[in-house]
Amino acid sequence: MTDVVPTTALSEIQLRLLCHDDIDRIKVLCGEWFPIEYPDSWYHDITSNKKFFSLAATFRGGIVGMIVAEIKSRTKVHKEDGDILASSFPVDTQVAYILSLGVVKEFRKHGIGSLLLDSLKEHISTTAQDHCKAIYLHVLTTNNTAIHFYENRDFKQHHYLPYYYSIRGVLKDGFTYVLYINGGHPPWTIFDYIHHIGSALASLSPCSIPQRIYRQAQNLLRSFLPWSGISSKSGIEYSRTM
C-alpha cells in the first residue's frame, strides 16, 4: 500500500463485506495491528459465519480497514462483562461486541475508523433495531490511541480487567468500554437510586408525598433485598461462549 494518501481518501473509500478470499490479506493486517495471534478458525469464522458483521473499507480495491462485530443476546455475554446492562432488561435484549476494528497506519486520521463504526451502528439499527442496548469492546490498558478513539465517540470505561490478555506468554491488563444506545444503561448504584428518589420527590404535590415515598422506598428495598418477602425478579446466569 502506498505511503502517499490523498487528503480526499475518505471520498474514495468503498465498503463491502469480508469474504473467504480476504483471509490472507486480513491475516497480514491483524498481524500489524494487534499483538494477539488469532487461530485460522477465527479468520474462517469472521469471513463465512453470518453471525458476524464483518465489513471491509477498501481504497482502490485494497483493504485499508475493517470492523468485525457480533450482535448477540445479553445472556451470551462473558462473565466478566455480565453487568453491562441492568438486570431489569429482558433476557432477549441484545448487545453488540466489537471483536476487531483497525485501519492501515497510512490511512489513519482520515475518518475511516469512524466510518466503520458508524456503519456498525447503522447495521444495528436495521437488524436489531431498538432491541440492542449497548456496544462494547475490550482494549489493552496501554493502547492509548484506541482508548482515545473510543472515548472521543462517547464510549465509557466500564471495567478494569487485570491480566485479561496473554500476549506472547505475558499477562496484560485490559479495559471494557461500552457505548449505551436505545435507552440501555448499566445497573444502578446507590447514588443513582438516591438521585432518582430525590428527583421524584421534587416533582410531587404535598398531598401525594406519603404514598409516593412508600412506593419509592418499597422499590428501593426490593432492589437491595431480593431475599425479602417483597417479590423480585430472579437473576440471570451468564455463560461464556465464543
From Swiss-Prot:
Residues 1-192, 237-242 are cytoplasmic. It catalyses: N-terminal L-methionyl-[transmembrane protein] + acetyl-CoA = N-terminal N(alpha)-acetyl-L-methionyl-[transmembrane protein] + CoA + H(+); L-lysyl-[protein] + acetyl-CoA = N(6)-acetyl-L-lysyl-[protein] + CoA + H(+). Substrate binds at Y38, L99, Y165. It is a peripheral membrane protein. Residues 162-173 are annotated as: Required for homodimerization. GO terms for biological process: cell population proliferation; chromosome segregation; N-terminal peptidyl-methionine acetylation; N-terminal protein amino acid acetylation; nucleosome assembly. The active site is at Y97, H138. Residues 193-236 dip into the membrane without crossing it. Transmembrane segments: none annotated. Residues 13-182 form the N-acetyltransferase domain. Keywords: Acyltransferase, Chromatin regulator, Chromosome partition, Golgi apparatus, Membrane, Transferase. Signal peptide: none annotated. It is found in: Golgi apparatus membrane. SUPFAM superfamilies: Acyl-CoA N-acyltransferases (Nat). It is an enzyme of class 2 (transferase). GO terms for molecular function: histone acetyltransferase activity; histone H4 acetyltransferase activity; protein homodimerization activity; protein N-terminal-methionine acetyltransferase activity; protein-N-terminal amino-acid acetyltransferase activity. GO terms for cellular component: Golgi membrane. Pfam families: Acetyltransf_1 (PF00583). Acetyl-CoA binds at L101, G102, V103, K109, H110, G111, I112, G113, S114, N143, Y150, E151, N152, R153. Its EC number is 2.3.1.259, 2.3.1.48. Belongs to the acetyltransferase family. NAA60 subfamily. Monomer and homodimer; monomer in presence of substrate and homodimer in its absence. N-alpha-acetyltransferase that specifically mediates the acetylation of N-terminal residues of the transmembrane proteins, with a strong preference for N-termini facing the cytosol. Displays N-terminal acetyltransferase activity towards a range of N-terminal sequences including those starting with Met-Lys, Met-Val, Met-Ala and Met-Met. Required for normal chromosomal segregation during anaphase. May also show histone acetyltransferase activity; such results are however unclear in vivo and would require additional experimental evidences. This is N-alpha-acetyltransferase 60. It comes from Danio rerio. The gene is naa60.
